[in-house]
């Protein structure tokens, strides 16, 4: 095995801490319960360290509950009830991709309030919408000291193996709003399919047949994005309208993002069957679409109608007639906290749960909600 040298510069973590971190990352990313790890002498050779240093690193991983030592047999990945019981701390992690803005802040307040009522403390982690920062925060969760975590993941799948590792090793997790595609786990969020379906159906009922969907298709992908796309598509199908992939458009890389929306909207309006409505993934796309329509001399809603998901019913766009799908952040935070507590205390339902909150439709053209 290739020797992996440790950093020995001033200010670097102690050698055992570096080994501990490397092994922790490898366990979470690719090991299963019962897998045997390499003997200490092999690890010492690999890291260029003495066996006492390796033994100390492994000892800490045993304390974290990731490993279990079996006399005469070796050291194995724990799981499935093996290893020492996790000490209860009545402390819960709250991992968010960002903490500013109405949507995350209301979920945070609601979750913290519900947890506090049950005498749980919270530790807030802000990944700043970075998959690397999120990976660091997930590693901190694995180090122990927490009973569980509420997680709103970054809208990219890079850390799915780390999430799976935490679940595999028994840390209670509940995902907020979304989770990586293909990952099994508890989720509490908006009913994204229904919100997209209802909004698109309203546009169709007003006579629109060429409806674009401005969304992420490749770079960012998670359950909420996928469910909104499926809701949009199903509404078209149920109303006898063929789904046109050309009308589903992801943002592209331009020096000025608004140029993308302008050029895309101009392209979709170019022929004798122009797009007459747009359903947007979220309110930032709505803002860009309104700017693009203005730049092209299009009036809303006379020339083109715009709909999309919003974080709250009151918005700077209130002077523009936009159909809004409003998410219930307070309910999401409260329900997620309740589900996490039930998992921690052992009284939760069998199997992973997906709890959805029905969004509110605010339609200025019909005067209805």
Where are the model-predicted features located?
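Extreme N-terminal segment that seeds HTH/winged-HTH DNA-binding domains in transcriptional regulators
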Residues: 1-48, 56-59, 86, 109
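Amphipathic helical "hinge" segments at domain boundaries
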Residues: 17-21, 29, 82-147, 218, ...
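Flexible loop/turn connectors
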Residues: 22, 262-369
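Beta-hairpin "wing" of winged helix-turn-helix
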Residues: 31, 36, 64-72, 76-79
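Periplasmic-binding protein-like
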Residues: 93-94, 146-153, 212-215, 272-282, ...
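Hinge/beta->alpha junction and helix N-cap segments in small-molecule ligand-binding domains
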Residues: 96-106, 125-133, 188-198, 214-264, ...
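Flexible loop/hinge segments that line or gate small-molecule binding clefts
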Residues: 152-198, 218, 284, 310-322
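Short acidic capping loops at alpha-helix termini that bridge into adjacent secondary structure
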Residues: 210, 243-247, 300-304
């Amino acid at each position: 095995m290739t020797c992996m040298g440790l950093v020995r510069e001033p200010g670097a973590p102690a050698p055992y801490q570096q080994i501990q971190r490397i092994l922790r990352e490898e366990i979470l990313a690719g090991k299963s319960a019962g897998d045997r790890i390499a003997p200490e002498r092999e690890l010492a050779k690999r890291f260029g360290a003495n066996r006492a240093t390796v033994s100390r690193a492994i000892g800490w991983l045993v304390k974290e509950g990731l490993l279990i030592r079996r006399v005469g047999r070796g050291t194995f990945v724990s799981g499935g009830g093996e290893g020492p019981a996790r000490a209860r701390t009545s402390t819960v992690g709250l991992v968010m991709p960002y903490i500013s803005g109405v949507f995350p802040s209301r979920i945070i307040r609601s979750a913290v309030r519900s947890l506090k009522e049950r005498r749980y403390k919270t530790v807030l982690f802000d990944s700043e919408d970075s998959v690397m920062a999120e990976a660091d925060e997930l590693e901190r969760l694995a180090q122990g000291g927490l009973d569980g975590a509420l997680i709103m993941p970054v809208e990219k799948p890079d850390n799915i193996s780390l999430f799976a590792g935490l679940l595999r090793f028994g840390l209670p997790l509940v995902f907020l709003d979304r989770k990586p595609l293909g990952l099994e786990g508890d989720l509490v969020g908006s009913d994204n399919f229904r919100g997209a379906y209802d909004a698109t159906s309203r546009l169709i009922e007003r006579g629109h047949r060429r409806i674009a969907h401005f969304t992420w298709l490749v770079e960012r992908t998670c359950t909420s994005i996928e469910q909104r796309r499926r809701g949009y598509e199903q509404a078209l199908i149920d109303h006898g309208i063929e789904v046109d992939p050309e009308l589903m458009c992801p943002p592209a890389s331009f020096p000025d993002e608004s140029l993308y929306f302008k050029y895309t909207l101009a392209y979709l309006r170019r022929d004798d069957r122009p797009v007459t409505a747009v359903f947007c993934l979220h309110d930032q796309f709505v803002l860009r679409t309104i700017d693009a329509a203005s730049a092209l001399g299009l009036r809303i809603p006379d020339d083109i109608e715009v709909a999309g998901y919003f974080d709250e019913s009151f918005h700077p766009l209130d002077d523009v007639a936009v159909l809004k799908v409003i998410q219930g952040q307070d309910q999401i935070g409260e329900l997620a906290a309740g589900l996490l507590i039930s998992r921690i205390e052992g009284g939760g339902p069998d199997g992973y749960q997906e709890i959805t909150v029905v969004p509110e439709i605010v339609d200025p053209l019909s005067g209805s909600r």
